[in-house]
């Protein structure tokens, strides 16, 4: 009964996940069993040596004593055999009382270990056979390595070139991305700025109120006039022709700039007066809708006001300049045979036509073609 209790207590089914753990434990148990067997062998060896000593002593003794000892040994052997028979009977009785479940558990626990041990011994004895999958993997790895090396060589050897000199340059769109990322933008360094173009100034009085801006920077007009006066004095003192030509161009550009600014100022004044009159007429009820000036009407009023503010000498010079400008413009638009030239110079044609510009036609700003003496055809 002791053996059945021992088997029922220690034997249990082994799960597949714990096979390695139990295999390690079984290995440790086998090692401990080997150690125990060695110790028992050493003890039996020592017992054997003692028995040999006793036999030697007995052999040295009397033969009668030896006979008595032999009889005693025979009796002891018979007793031992009887004891062994009783023990075997007890073991068989206990095994017959063991349940089939306990035997199945014991067989399940012993079976896989023996298979694993046999497989391990076979693998240790027999060399590992080459697998076809390993060969395929090795070939694929070699092919990839060769392809990588070929691509590296091509990149080094080939240079970006154009098919012709007229073709656009070839540039790769692949660029390495920097590992650094701007998480927080640093504060911008303040730059020097012109207050005339400052958005804060323009928002307050620039675009919304141009009149306020012009009034705020009215002192610049005085600076420009002083600068023009200094340029004229320097032009009078300079004797070098190159410097005189440069000063002359600068003076002309400055005068044109001042003249354009005066014209714009005059236009603003005329528009302001016209708006004021129209508002007054609407307020009085004489008009229901305001009249907006056209560009041509505005230009005429600006020119009229400009000539009114001039003295007689300046007005004459301005009219003469305007007349020459208009005549030259109309002359360019005419054919070569009808262009008016000074004196008796005729255009290329041998003098068949005589071109003149009578004073009466010049006053109205037109040119005439004189085909015969005494006849004038105004265009």
From Swiss-Prot:
Pfam families in the record: RRP36
Main subcellular localisation: nucleus
Keyword field: Coiled coil, Nucleus, Ribonucleoprotein, Ribosome biogenesis, rRNA processing
Membrane-spanning parts: none
Biased segments, Basic and acidic residues type: 134-161, 327-342
GO terms (BP aspect): maturation of SSU-rRNA from tricistronic rRNA transcript (SSU-rRNA, 5.8S rRNA, LSU-rRNA)
Keyword Nucleus: yes
Region span, Disordered: 14-219, 313-350
GO cellular component, one term: 90S preribosome
InterPro entries: RRP36
Coiled-coil intervals, chain numbering: 133-162, 224-284
Keyword rRNA processing listed: yes
Biased composition (Acidic residues): 49-89
Domain of life: Eukaryota
Location in or out of the cell: Nucleus, Nucleolus
Family: Belongs to the RRP36 family.
Function, in words: Component of the 90S pre-ribosome involved in the maturation of rRNAs. Required for early cleavages of the pre-RNAs in the 40S ribosomal subunit maturation pathway.
Subunit structure: Associates with 90S and pre-40S pre-ribosomal particles.
Protein name, entry field: rRNA biogenesis protein rrp36
Species whose genome carries this gene: Aspergillus niger (strain ATCC MYA-4892 / CBS 513.88 / FGSC A1513)
Taxonomic path: Eukaryota, Fungi, Dikarya, Ascomycota, Pezizomycotina
Encoding gene (name): rrp36
